[in-house]
Amino acid sequence: MTAPSCAFPVQFRQPSVSGLSQITKSLYISNGVAANNKLMLSSNQITMVINVSVEVVNTLYEDIQYMQVPVADSPNSRLCDFFDPIADHIHSVEMKQGRTLLHCAAGVSRSAALCLAYLMKYHAMSLLDAHTWTKSCRPIIRPNSGFWEQLIHYEFQLFGKNTVHMVSSPVGMIPDIYEKEVRLMIPL
């Protein structure tokens, strides 16, 4: 696995689950509560907040731009419609020396999926490497199965091959990277 070229060296990166989790020098993920914390936003020099939810309302602060991506955390939601536009926007903010906070309600599924799409597109990371890296920065990420299917399709579009596959399990279709975990939880 190769780290994103603009990521902090591992020794400076601290995994976070409650506050803002730094993924690259210009991209962070959080939950809705942290996204409305003025001190967290200002101390991390956030210039753009992308709200990937229908249920979280942002408190608007001066000097921060806001974007809404109204997608429910449902396997049937078409988050893939936003993969390219949001990845492009995150990249555009970075090119202007800005910092983006990507958040949903919990900072687990929707924002994580869009982060993975961005890392694949702009850091040429495989889906597997993007997931491994993002999980090392924010251990609680877990996109829903529908988002995984969309990410797998996107990876194939970008690179012509897949590093993650959906497999059948006692709890339904899951990405193969969760297979061992599910088997430990549900003995066959």
Curated annotation (Swiss-Prot):
Catalytic activities: O-phospho-L-tyrosyl-[protein] + H2O = L-tyrosyl-[protein] + phosphate; O-phospho-L-seryl-[protein] + H2O = L-seryl-[protein] + phosphate; O-phospho-L-threonyl-[protein] + H2O = L-threonyl-[protein] + phosphate
Summary of activators and inhibitors of this protein: Activated by manganese ions, inhibited by iodoacetic acid.
UniProt cross-references to SMART domains, sorted A to Z: DSPc
Thermal behavior of activity: Optimum temperature is 55 degrees Celsius.
Tissue-by-tissue expression: Widely expressed with highest levels in liver, brain, ovary and testis.
Keyword terms of this UniProt record: Cytoplasm, Hydrolase, Membrane, Mitochondrion, Mitochondrion inner membrane, Nucleus, Protein phosphatase
Span of domain Tyrosine-protein phosphatase: 19-160
Gene Ontology biological process terms from the UniProt entry: dephosphorylation; peptidyl-threonine dephosphorylation; peptidyl-tyrosine dephosphorylation
Described purpose of this protein according to its UniProt entry: Can dephosphorylate single and diphosphorylated synthetic MAPK peptides, with preference for the phosphotyrosine and diphosphorylated forms over phosphothreonine. In vitro, dephosphorylates p-nitrophenyl phosphate (pNPP).
UniProt-recorded name of the protein: Dual specificity protein phosphatase 18
Provenance organism: Homo sapiens
Gene transcribed to yield this protein: DUSP18
